[in-house]
UniProtKB/Swiss-Prot annotation:
<dbReference type="Pfam" id="PF01386">
    <property type="entry name" value="Ribosomal_L25p"/>
</dbReference>
<dbReference type="GO" id="GO:0006412">
    <property type="term" value="P:translation"/>
</dbReference>
<dbReference type="InterPro" id="IPR020057">
    <property type="entry name" value="Ribosomal_bL25_b-dom"/>
</dbReference>
<dbReference type="Pfam" id="PF14693">
    <property type="entry name" value="Ribosomal_TL5_C"/>
</dbReference>
<dbReference type="GO" id="GO:0022625">
    <property type="term" value="C:cytosolic large ribosomal subunit"/>
</dbReference>
<protein>
    <recommendedName>
        <fullName>Large ribosomal subunit protein bL25</fullName>
    </recommendedName>
</protein>
<comment type="function">
    <text>This is one of the proteins that binds to the 5S RNA in the ribosome where it forms part of the central protuberance.</text>
</comment>
<keyword id="KW-0687">Ribonucleoprotein</keyword>
<feature type="compositionally biased region" description="Basic and acidic residues">
    <location>
        <begin position="196"/>
        <end position="207"/>
    </location>
</feature>
<dbReference type="InterPro" id="IPR029751">
    <property type="entry name" value="Ribosomal_L25_dom"/>
</dbReference>
<dbReference type="InterPro" id="IPR020056">
    <property type="entry name" value="Rbsml_bL25/Gln-tRNA_synth_N"/>
</dbReference>
<keyword id="KW-0694">RNA-binding</keyword>
<dbReference type="InterPro" id="IPR001021">
    <property type="entry name" value="Ribosomal_bL25_long"/>
</dbReference>
<dbReference type="InterPro" id="IPR020930">
    <property type="entry name" value="Ribosomal_uL5_bac-type"/>
</dbReference>
<comment type="subunit">
    <text>Part of the 50S ribosomal subunit; part of the 5S rRNA/L5/L18/L25 subcomplex. Contacts the 5S rRNA. Binds to the 5S rRNA independently of L5 and L18.</text>
</comment>
<feature type="region of interest" description="Disordered">
    <location>
        <begin position="171"/>
        <end position="207"/>
    </location>
</feature>
<comment type="similarity">
    <text>Belongs to the bacterial ribosomal protein bL25 family. CTC subfamily.</text>
</comment>
Amino acid sequence: MATTLEVQKRETTQHSEVTRLRSEGKVPGIIYGYKSENVPVSVDSLELIKAVRDNGRNAVFSVTVDGKKLNVLLHEYQVDPLKDVLVHVDLLAVDMNEEVETDVRVVLVGDAPGVKAGGVLQQIIHDVKVSATPEKLPETIELDISSLEIGDVLTTNDLPENKDYVVQAEEEETVVTVSAPRAEEEPTTTEAPEPEAVHGNDEEPVE
């Protein structure tokens, strides 16, 4: 069952109104998608953060706008990099019976023997596109790296299959690898030339 999220419809999108909302701890946003035109809304910042923390980034939330109930996903959000606060959210209205596509984080699990042997673990892909009905969207996809030795690679083909969703990614794209450690360069030393021998005067002294 979708978690309820309280939103308020915004009557204006003027900059002064947006500034006022943010000063009150609210985040301006927009709802669009299934059976919904672009509707400007606002949501309490702390309530939204708590809802996502408790239910997950890809959870379905139930909202009511103009007396109409909608199921929405947190599709996109913007964060002020200096203040580290939410400044805008996009809520995607969805049909619970229709597939949607969204980003899902790839989480590495296990300990790679190659790392213990001195190799360097490099995760190239951190998120992949996944399609599923809203209630089947995974929060993360786990990729087991416990078999990786130095020089080994895991690709998108190695991501675990699941009947509830489909990973939309190019085949054989590198997700993670364990590379050999860089060899330390030996310091270059230059031998100093040996000093030339100093010869004395071979002439006999004059008496």
